[in-house]
Amino acid sequence: MKPLLLAVSLGLIAALQAHHLLASDEEIQDVSGTWYLKAMTVDREFPEMNLESVTPMTLTTLEGGNLEAKVTMLISGRCQEVKAVLEKTDEPGKYTADGGKHVAYIIRSHVKDHYIFYCEGELHGKPVRGVKLVGRDPKNNLEALEDFEKAAGARGLSTESILIPRQSETCSPGSD
């Protein structure tokens, strides 16, 4: 279950396309703090994973430019805390995680205070790709969602299966 959560959580890192640019090192310094998962899509179905809600995600800039991401998700009635260290590479906006098994990209959105996260990795021996939209404010932003859909589509991911998770300040199993 942890590799599945890591793969999906690392989908927090954005889609590459011509009109989306990787975030610069200076911009990455500004990503520390609280972020809200606004939308996500992956290229595979995970029937065993019923994402019910998410808490705000915390990103922390570590020494050497690495990032730590922490989020708690209510999945199939159970709170799952996910914590990952994203290791900086020589390419701005590009990170690796889980011993290099996952490659993550932070891409700036055209909408202020929003980023699109894209991740490629492997889960149960099969390749998996995911895209997430995060923003500083929990309210949905249609312009940011349109930007996200374009980025997901440009990477070959379905825009028909976009999930917009319910926001929750804390994880409480059994709450609605």
Swiss-Prot record:
GO BP terms in the entry: proteolysis; sensory perception of taste
Keyword Flavoprotein: no
Keywords associated with the record: Disulfide bond, Secreted, Sensory transduction, Signal, Taste, Transport
Mitochondrion among keywords: no
Coiled coil: none
Name of one Pfam family that matches: Lipocalin
Tissue and organ distribution: Mainly expressed in lachrymal and salivary glands. Also expressed in the prostate.
Signal peptide from the UniProt entry: 1-18
One GO MF term attached to the UniProt entry: chloride ion binding
Localization per Swiss-Prot or TrEMBL: Secreted
Cellular component aspect of the GO annotation: extracellular region; extracellular space
UniProt xrefs under CDD domains: lipocalin_1_3_4_13-like
Paired cysteines (S-S): C79-C171
InterPro entries in the record: Calycin, Lipocalin, Lipocln_cytosolic_FA-bd_dom, von_Ebner_gland
Family that this chain belongs to: Belongs to the calycin superfamily. Lipocalin family.
PANTHER family referenced in this protein's UniProt entry, alphabetically: LIPOCALIN, LIPOCALIN-1
Role this protein plays: Could play a role in taste reception. Could be necessary for the concentration and delivery of sapid molecules in the gustatory system. Can bind various ligands, with chemical structures ranging from lipids and retinoids to the macrocyclic antibiotic rifampicin and even to microbial siderophores. Exhibits an extremely wide ligand pocket.
Oligomeric form and interacting partners: Predominantly monomer. May form homodimer. Interacts with LMBR1L; this interaction mediates the endocytosis of LCN1.
Name this polypeptide is given: Lipocalin-1
Gene: LCN1
